Amino acid sequence: MTKKLTFPDSFLWGGATAANQCEGAYDADGRGLANVDVVPIGEDRLAIITGKKKMFDFEEGYFYPAKEAIDMYHRFKEDIALFGEMGFKTYRLSIAWSRIFPKGDELEPNEAGLKFYEDLFKECHKYGIEPLVTITHFDCPMHLIEQYGGWRNRLMLEFYERLCRTLFTRYKGLVKYWLTFNEINMILHAPFMGAGLCFEEGENEEQVKYQAAHHELVASAIATKLAHEIDPENKVGCMLAAGQNYPNTCHPRDVWAGMEEDRKNYFFIDVQARGEYPNYAKKAWEREGITVEMTEEDLQLLKEHTVDFVSFSYYASRVASGDPKVNELTEGNIFASLKNPYLEASEWGWQIDPLGLRITLNTIWDRYQKPMFIVENGLGAVDTPDENGYVADDYRIDYLAAHVKAMREAINEDGVVLWGYTTWGCIDLVSAGTGEMKKRYGFIYVDRDNEGKGTLKRSKKKSFDWYKEVIATNGASVK
């Protein structure tokens, strides 16, 4: 008799958002300006998030979608009630650093910001929802960028430590699952968002990125140390933008190219989960003339304070080639990939690969042997509501169901340890990559368009009831 495939009874089902993509209220109650506020929609967006073009304030002629976003700051009770109706066990959200320390380098926090998140966490618990909190999700106070150069500056360790100490102390008993940095490997692809970096002409960009990465890695270790000291119940995770790099062919040079691309991603988690810099990275820095300044104390912190679990986003797999003539690209999560002829793609060119999620789960488990948490997964699509705001999003249901099956197989047939799953953008929000509203992920439709027009009214999509059933049956409803 075949054993029925199931999820653990303790499995944490839920959804995920980020402060800068949903809260809005960019200047409410003492909040300071952050890098994510000044990234406009349109053709300059990519140059700004990659640090090639400087924009440190709002400028005429641009639309900044994060200023209002979906106004969750004023509507969180309504939104969390909807999450509760779906039966969420967990809700992943992030803290806007500049709500807590408006400039980032103050000695005392902003009480209004602390109170907002306290109220939000209490609202979650009212519905039996466990908060999963990202300390920084592409979020850096602009003052820290203008005054100190963002994460290139070692002083950021002090400011981040103060933020963490404040959060862990204030929310002790309210939050026990923490992520230190969202998609930490994005520093290599979107350095202004990932680390508040802007580059000067002629500067060695890779040198700056890896120095900033070192500071973030040490900051993550400091956060892990503090979290465990302040509350031994705390669980701290790292967070990676994941997705396996398949070789374009079985030619050894393509296999090698895929391995090299994977190493660029896993480099960060190698440090956070294993506690030391991998030899391949040291050798690469040597070859490329990159000198990362670090102290013995840094190395000790990294070694002694590794993460409790590994979390990641998964949207698509990627393809790599060692042949420079192979160059048919397709879009992905900020960074592009070679096209995979065996896969279908979303409207934005992201390749749909549920088996790739199972492969990624196994790769991460084999590499680290630490519990995992899938904290982003979903399908960005154009949704067309009827006159009542209802969207029959069967395409989203199909995408998510296929990925739920892949998780279930990885748990039951491969033996990976997976704590939970939060779909990305459980309510429609502003896209981090493009700044669009029309690229929707949610179970809940929000009446707002790319120009900021709309009532912000919330309405349930077909996928709302589907996911409610998935959670109620602990995944058994997905056949």
Locate the predicted segments by residue.
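Active-site region of glycoside hydrolase catalytic domains
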Residues: T2-E60, E85, K103-D105, L114-K479
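Active-site mouth loops of central-metabolism enzymes
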Residues: G61-R75, R152-R154
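Short, flexible active-site loop motifs that bind/organize anionic cofactors or intermediates
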Residues: A66, Y73, G104-L107, E347
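Catalytic domains of carbohydrate-active enzymes, especially glycoside hydrolases
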Residues: D71, R75-A96, E304-V310
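Glycine-rich, proline-tolerant flexible connector loops at the mouths of alpha/beta enzymes
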Residues: I95-P109
